[in-house]
Amino acid sequence: MTIERRTVLVGAAALTAAYATPVQASTRIPLRGMNYDTEREVWLTPYVRHDIKAIRHQLHCTGILLLGSDLHRLTEAAEIATAEGLKVWFEPRQFDKGARETLAFIKAVGHVAERLKAGLSLGCELTIFMDGLVPGKNYIERAQALATTPDYNQRLNNFLATALTTVRSIFHGPITYSSGVWEDVAWQGFDMVGIDLYRDSSNEKTYASDVRALHRHRKPVIITEFGCCTYRGADKRGGDGFDIIDWTKNPPVIKGHHVRDERVQARYIDECLTVHERQGVHGTFVYNFIETESPYMRNPKLDMDMAGFSVVKVFPDYARTGRWAPKLSFHTITQHFK
């Protein structure tokens, strides 16, 4: 059994009626933000500052979720974002590391978050991205092993309880966790419910009720990740849309005959944001602002941007120029957030 991002919340629709009151009209989301991944080959302060200014002043975001494993980069981006007036949230990542290293890095980021009065997520989908909760050498093997590891939620919650205790001793701001839809998190000790919730063919009819059901925990809800790639049919694949690249080729190529279509991404984000507004979430973070190693190319077989979630497209000369251009989805987000 392979667990993909498109796996839906188990029992969400059934729980909706019992625990959540439908929100009838759109409400303005307080925390309107973008994911900003600090893991990249090119990291230049002027480029980062330009990106973050665009997030604040062109997209009209109120928040930013910083992802990464480099404390210096996370700190630099957070300081720039704070100066621009964004509410910073950190999501420290130590993929494929064990509990000790993961916890140490969360604590290190917690010190920075305390100084900057930021928010903190304790990680991303740790059952597949952290070593030790589920058997496997990487996230693919661990995802496949979920079905044969019945106590993985207990293991996850034990780790999160330890992390909460550790972080609360040095950090006094809001804490959440960026959960996978297959994870059953004990949210009692958290300030907010966080979930990476993509829409795809398996949950497009229940997406609104899945979001609404999250209110059963009686805490503010943050959609920590959602987004769509940039080709026809990507809206049906949701978080798995990136998997159309043949990495065995040199250079890598797009598999099959996919057709670039920015309208698909824009429409998907528009529809999901509308759901988030109507269901009264506290925060939503679009994934992702920029993917610098996935440049746009006119040749569709080489157009790595097609397989990316970013709302801006970079060009092959990015390392030298920092040049990017907004996609249609960029303007869609602006209309929702301004």
Predicted regions and their residues:
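N-terminal secretory signal peptides
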Residues: M1-I3
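N-terminal export signals
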Residues: T7-A25
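Boundary/entry segment of secreted carbohydrate-active catalytic domains
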Residues: S26-A54
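Catalytic domains of carbohydrate-active enzymes, especially glycoside hydrolases
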Residues: V48-D70
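Active-site groove signature of glycoside hydrolases
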Residues: V109-N153
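Aromatic-lined carbohydrate-recognition surfaces of secreted/lumenal glycan-active proteins
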Residues: N157-E183, I223-E225, V286-Y287
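Glycoside hydrolase catalytic-domain groove-lining segments
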Residues: A186-V253
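Aromatic-rich peripheral "rim/lid" segments of glycoside hydrolase catalytic domains that contact
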Residues: Y287-K338
